[in-house]
A protein has these predicted regions:
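Membrane-embedded alpha-helical segments of inner-membrane proteins
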Residues: 1-148
Length: 150
């Protein structure tokens, strides 16, 4: 069961990573054109892109949450299998797994096919933004306050 949970979390991380790249890689002129034609995915993506701080916020909150949870589960699995030296080995293996399957590959696919990634992913992103809005709002406030001194 832990392995299934771990795999699901890596897939969730891949979703967030690809969503970020897909949304940010959309051609704005084509997006505007499709929005005028009432393309549902373009309308959703456009709405999300109107507030990029909230979009990036919800993506980063989701991605960090699933990555930390995946790390915890991976450590539990490794300790059960290997024992004490597991945390170091887990960190190395998890870094490679996340880089390959949850970062580089999904982001590359999204950069190549932004519309195919961004439009469908906008459905869940809108839902997550509604659910996590208070957290996103708070993170953005703290982040903006930290930028005042820069």
């Amino acid at each position: 069961m832990l392995l299934v949970s771990f795999a699901a979390l890596i897939l969730a991380s891949a979703y967030f990573s690809s969503s970020e790249t897909g949304m940010m890689s959309l051609n704005r002129y084509r997006l505007k054109h499709l929005k005028r034609e009432k393309h549902a995915g373009a309308m959703r993506a456009s709405r999300l892109l109107e507030k990029p701080d909230k979009l990036i916020g919800v993506i980063l909150i989701g991605n960090n949450f699933v990555n930390f949870l995946a790390a915890s589960i991976a450590t539990s699995i490794a300790i059960a299998i290997v024992g004490d030296p597991a945390p170091i080995a887990t960190a190395i293996i998890l870094t490679l797994v996340v880089l390959i399957f949850a970062e580089v590959t999904p982001k590359t696919i999204a950069a190549l096919y932004p519309e195919k990634v961004a439009y469908p992913s906008s459905i869940l992103l809108i839902l997550l933004l509604k659910i996590l809005y208070p957290v996103v709002w708070m993170v953005n406030i703290v982040s903006n306050l930290s930028l005042i001194h820069i």
